[in-house]
UniProtKB/Swiss-Prot annotation:
Induction: By zinc depletion. One of its GO terms (cellular component) is cytosol. The lineage of its organism: Eukaryota, Fungi, Dikarya, Ascomycota, Saccharomycotina. Keywords: Cytoplasm, Signal, Zinc. It holds the Pfam family Vel1p. Its main location: cytoplasm. This is VEL1-related protein SCY_5430. It comes from Saccharomyces cerevisiae (strain YJM789). InterPro entries: Vel1-like. It comes from the Eukaryota. Disulfide bonds: none annotated. It is found in: Cytoplasm, Cytosol. Belongs to the VEL1 family.
Amino acid sequence: MSFLNIFTFFSVLVSVATAVRFDLTNVTCNNLHGPHCGTYVMEVVGQNGTFLGQSTFAGADVLTESAGDAWARYLGQETRFLPKLTTIASNDTKNFSPLIFTTNIYTCNPQSFGDAMVPFANTVTGEIEYNSWADTADNASFITGLANQLFNSTQYGVQVASCYPNFASVILSTPTVNIFAANETLPDYCTAIQLKAVCPPDAGFA
């Protein structure tokens, strides 16, 4: 890549807005019901009825194989059988389910998510990884894991944004949710978001 191309690329990055940081270290227990201090969903600030969750879709390999093979993969809980994309959407969006947080009994801060395994982009290795959302899990990547960056957002200084890359607009009707480092700037297809804790019944979730 030539020097001119590199300079142009970085000039574009510098021209875009920086994502909003959010802090989950001061979540209170008021009106939060469930195990420990409570369970709750994360709503996007300024977008009523839009929550952090997952969209599920069937891959091409699933659609082309026999019903018996597909059923066996489903029963075996194969992680890549029905890929889940972390996104933001309303409760009535098809194939969407919100991520349910559970709080720690001592601190009332987020401890784990309802789903056990969620794909995320490891910006250190540049690979897609599957990580436990539990903050205390043995197999959690303490620094690079998406879950731990969310749980300790102030310490790690992460930024959160909703993004609409070209591939997502083709296969999904909802954007991806991306985590950026504090010193990164956003691509032009990303928009900064901020999240807040909401009690599931108050948000319309049973």
